[in-house]
């Protein structure tokens, strides 16, 4: 009785709601900026030579690994994704400079967990939860007006702990948390296997293997250039933000006076829009140079081109491919068993 | 990947439920997709044995860099900010960034098929690094036909003037006196710039509305139910679709000056 | 560099600039003390006109009205870019963009100016002109100039004091001639003295001045 009066006192209700709304994202921001930083982000995409099995494998095997792991993760129940995630992380032991890579990859994966699970626990659409779990339990109810933000809203009457029966409640659901964890496991299995490919293969080998698999070189080129430009875009973003800071821009409004505070906030928004345009210009300014560099190296000049270093499937690759095919078949079989299929993805 | 699994009352294959009980009838989607893929086949037709005959190297570079910007925006920056306002497009900033960048790619490349290629590369990348290939190839068809189709159609008419307040008017054939006549033909036609502010506004509205409507109209109306087997009420579908037209118009007009400025700076 | 410009905070300790603790300075006070010119002008141009770019700096430094107008006019006349005021900074040539980026910092009249590879991407003639201009401003306004460069000729010609940064620490400091004297360390630091210095040393006057001689015609 007392607990219900405390928990659902209007003021306390709003405070708890706001904390729940913002705690997850703030934690994610903290993890990314304090533990990794932009520099760490960029080192994710830098290739360092190595000698172990994983470096000697054909890039096509590793691409297949990434595709099959993401596919199986997408069609099966969450704990199979979790097992595959652990298995892929075990392969990281074969990478050189492992400590540096884990220092970046682990907070990123943790941030992905917290971010997705937290968001889905309050934002998962009710219709999804109803289809997947057939029953939805509300753990805590927010003020009704927050439904406009897109927070999960049940249709019908629900029993809420410490509050009793509520019609069309808006709030945090147990199924939402489970759902968030499920799709996070799927996502991290995909992220980990994709990063494994990028960590252990030089970009030119990826391009070559894509071309060997029959993809038009134009698509392979565009895809690879996009992947390799991601760190450049991050670096540009960091530099532009730093140059604004060097010119005295404060990204946090400081004023106590509410009117000044609004004016400062509007100014910050304007500065951020200016910064975004600058980042786009700074990134696209290189386009002409890149195009000339590609043309000089006879990009698209010949349909079939040969390479100095050929890539060939070795014994390890055949073993790995056989294992992957077994995994795929097992995944498809398991996904058909009752209650073992995957939940749909909410973008 | 290529096997059918019986799951409950649906056929499920790679996470696809093939639920045809949708708001937009399946044949409308089929006809629309076939028409658009025919357009892409024409736009990306090989020239001298090379696919994407019309595209120059720099076009691929622009598309790749914009795909990288989209990846950074959607997977590195968006997750940092709580997603508020998912019901309407007005405050849903992931869509604002997508509108801006896809329209920018179309504006910089200015050839039919460029919006489709950008969306295709972006979807492929996001499948590799984030979503996984569950539900494919239908998500590809959804993204390409709903985010890019109308912009690509419009580009047939607007071409390189897309997102510029001008239109090109042919002044007639510039005399091709050179007897060799190697590289004459259409490029030798002199074009005159005519101011066309109304067309610029149409560019902006069309781009904004296309992308804003993708989720409420196409996804809720067909692809979501078809692939995931869930259902939406027709009233929700209709209301959010209509609301998204207004939001798309506003967004298109807001991003247009920025795209115009960037296009002027870079070309 | 970033620490000095107040972009990052030191993990421990503090930085004293003219008796101000840099970590406690607000953005407004910081721009009046330190200006930072980035490597690539595109990294620091935000506005759609050159005038807007200069006004942006002044707004952040809380300089308004007539004073702001005066400063803008002075700096553009000084750098010879007054005809560019209404143009878009992004559409200018590399050299012009460089001048605009320097102007955008100098208009706040900082007491310390940090230049990160100021002549990158400029041809020889252009970089000499720019360096002379910056040096003139430095002498007239009495600013402290900090410059990051890999160009040893510039180190020899323009600097009063040189610091060799190697492996995250200051490996050596002294006047440029002393740095060039430490020839056994050069391969490790990855520097090679300018030819002028090699010549003066080979004729037996190792510490002869290699400063740029500037003649004031007035």
Regions found by a protein language model. Give the residues of each.
Chain A
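Juxtamembrane/interface alpha-helical elements of multi-pass membrane proteins
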Residues: 105-262
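Hydrophobic, aromatic-rich alpha-helical transmembrane segments
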Residues: 11, 15, 56-60, 98-105, ...
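Helix-loop junctions at the membrane-solvent interface of multi-pass transporters
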Residues: 75-76, 94-95, 122-126, 337
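Hydrophobic transmembrane alpha-helices of multi-pass, membrane-embedded glycosylation machinery
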Residues: 85-93, 109-110
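Short, aromatic-rich membrane-interface segments at the entry and exit
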Residues: 77-85, 101-106
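Structural signal for the C-terminal ends of transmembrane alpha-helices
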Residues: 91-99, 200-201
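Transmembrane alpha-helix interface motif
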Residues: 1-57, 61, 65-78, 86-90, ...
């Amino acid at each position: 009785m007392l607990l219900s009066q405390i928990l659902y006192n209007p003021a306390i209700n709003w405070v708890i709601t706001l904390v729940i709304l913002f705690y997850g994202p703030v934690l994610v921001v903290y993890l990314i900026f304090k533990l990794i930083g932009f520099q760490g982000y960029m080192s994710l995409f830098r290739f360092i030579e190595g000698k172990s099995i994983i470096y000697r494998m054909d890039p096509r095997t590793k691409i297949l690994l990434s595709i099959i792991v993401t596919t199986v993760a997408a069609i099966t129940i969450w704990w199979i994704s979790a097992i595959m995630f652990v298995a892929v992380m075990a392969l990281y032991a074969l990478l050189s400079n492992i400590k540096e890579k884990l220092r970046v990859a682990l907070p990123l994966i943790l941030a992905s967990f917290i971010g997705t699970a937290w968001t889905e626990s309050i934002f998962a659409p009710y219709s999804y939860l109803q289809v997947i779990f057939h029953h939805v339990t509300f753990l805590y109810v927010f003020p009704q007006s927050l439904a406009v933000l897109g927070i999960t809203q049940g249709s019908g009457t629900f029993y809420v702990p410490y509050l009793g029966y509520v019609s069309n409640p808006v709030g945090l659901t147990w199924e939402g948390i489970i759902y968030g964890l499920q799709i996070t496991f799927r996502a991290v299995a995909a992220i980990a296997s994709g990063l494994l490919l990028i960590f252990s293969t030089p970009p030119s080998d990826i391009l070559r293997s894509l071309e060997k698999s029959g993809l038009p070189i134009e698509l392979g080129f565009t895809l690879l250039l996009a992947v390799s430009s991601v760190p450049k875009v991050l670096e540009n973003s960091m530099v532009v933000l730093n140059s604004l800071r060097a010119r005295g821009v404060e990204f946090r409004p400081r004023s106590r006076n509410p009117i000044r505070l609004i004016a400062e906030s509007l100014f910050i928004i304007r500065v951020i829009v200016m910064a975004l345009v600058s980042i786009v210009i700074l990134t696209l300014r290189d386009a002409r140079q890149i195009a000339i560099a590609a043309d000089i190296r006879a990009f698209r000049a010949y349909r079939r081109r040969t390479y100095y270093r050929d890539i060939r499937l070795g014994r390890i690759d055949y073993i790995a491919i056989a294992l992957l095919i077994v995994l795929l078949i097992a995944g498809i079989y398991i996904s058909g068993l009752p209650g073992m299929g995957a939940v749909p993805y909410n973008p | 990947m290529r096997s059918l699994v019986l799951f409950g009352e649906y056929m499920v294959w790679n996470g696809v439920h093939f639920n045809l009980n949708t708001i937009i009838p399946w044949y409308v989607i089929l006809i629309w997709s076939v028409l658009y893929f025919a357009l892409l086949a024409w736009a990306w037709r090989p020239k001298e044995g090379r696919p994407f005959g019309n595209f120059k190297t720099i076009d691929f570079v622009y598309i790749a860099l914009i795909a990288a910007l989209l990846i950074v925006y959607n997977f590195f920056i968006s997750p940092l900010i709580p997603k508020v306002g998912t019901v309407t497009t007005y405050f849903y900033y992931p869509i604002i960034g997508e509108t801006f960048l896809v329209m920018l790619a179309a504006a910089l490349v200015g050839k039919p098929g460029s919006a489709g290629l950008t969306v295709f590369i972006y979807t492929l990348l996001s499948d590799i690094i984030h979503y996984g290939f569950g539900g494919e190839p239908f998500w590809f068809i959804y993204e390409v036909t709903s985010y890019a189709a109308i912009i690509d159609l419009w580009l047939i008419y607007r071409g390189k003037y897309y997102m510029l307040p001008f239109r090109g008017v042919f002044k007639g054939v510039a005399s091709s006196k050179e007897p060799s006549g190697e590289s004459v033909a259409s490029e030798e036609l002199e074009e005159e710039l005519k101011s066309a502010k109304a067309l610029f506004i149409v560019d902006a509205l069309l781009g904004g509305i296309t992308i804003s409507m993708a989720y409420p109209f196409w996804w809720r109306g067909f692809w979501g139910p078809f692939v995931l087997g869930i259902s939406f009420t027709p009233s929700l579908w209709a209301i959010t679709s209509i609301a998204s037209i207004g939001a798309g118009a506003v967004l298109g007009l807001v991003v247009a000056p920025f795209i115009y400025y960037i296009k002027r700076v870079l070309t | 560099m970033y620490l000095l410009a107040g972009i990052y905070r030191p993990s421990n300790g503090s930085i004293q600039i003219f008796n101000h603790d840099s970590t406690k300075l607000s953005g407004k006070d910081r721009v009046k003390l330190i200006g930072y010119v980035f490597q690539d002008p595109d990294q620091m141009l935000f506005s759609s006109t050159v005038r807007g770019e200069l006004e942006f700096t002044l707004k952040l430094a809380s300089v308004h009205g007539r004073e702001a107008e005066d400063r803008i006019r002075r700096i553009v006349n000084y750098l010879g870019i007054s005809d560019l005021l209404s143009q878009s900074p992004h559409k200018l040539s590399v050299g012009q963009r460089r001048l605009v980026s320097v102007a955008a910092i100098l208009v706040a009249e900082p007491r310390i100016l940090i230049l990160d590879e100021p002549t990158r991407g400029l041809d020889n003639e252009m970089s000499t002109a720019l360096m002379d201009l910056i040096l003139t401003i430095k002498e007239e306004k009495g600013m402290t100039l900090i410059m990051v460069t890999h160009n040893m000729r510039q180190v020899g010609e323009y600097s009063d004091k040189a610091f060799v940064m190697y492996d995250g620490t200051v490996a050596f400091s002294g006047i440029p001639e002393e740095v060039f004297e430490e020839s056994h360390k050069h391969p490790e630091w990855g520097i090679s003295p300018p030819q002028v210095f090699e010549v003066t040393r080979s004729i037996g006057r190792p510490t002869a001045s290699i400063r740029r001689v500037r003649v004031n015609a007035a």
